Amino acid sequence: MKREVLNMGYRSDVAYVIRFGTVDQRDTFIELVKHRNDEHLKQALDECETNYDLPIITFFTDDVKWYPDYPEVRAHNHLMEWAVELYKEAGYRVVELGEDGEEQENEDGDCDCLDDYIYTRHSLETDFPRVKQEVKNV
């Protein structure tokens, strides 16, 4: 199934996880990518974390222009899509959070178990100056 490419052209934080049925499947997939004649796909894999005891590949970047027509972004999308095409047990979840707080999610495969890996938390923080304390003379 072709992943819907999300158009978030301004600065975004992006994270995804690809889950395989087994660690062996994940490792075989990594080797397939390394032997492809596609430098963008190899670079996308190099930007991912793969050194897990679990059968997953993860990616996170922040404050990036995530244009869907950029070759680097297309490569990351292809990495997720190809894993699901090759392995019926595979699935992925991707979350993109724009600088305006807009959140977009996409997933493929049986990804209920991937919700714990990527989630957003909205919070309000302040850095007000310290309140001047009155000193009372007794």
Language-model features and meaning:
Residues 1-2, 137:
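Glycine- and charge-rich intrinsically disordered segments
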Residues 2-34:
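Short, extreme N-terminal segment that most often corresponds to the first beta-strand
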Residues 32-138:
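Charged interaction segments
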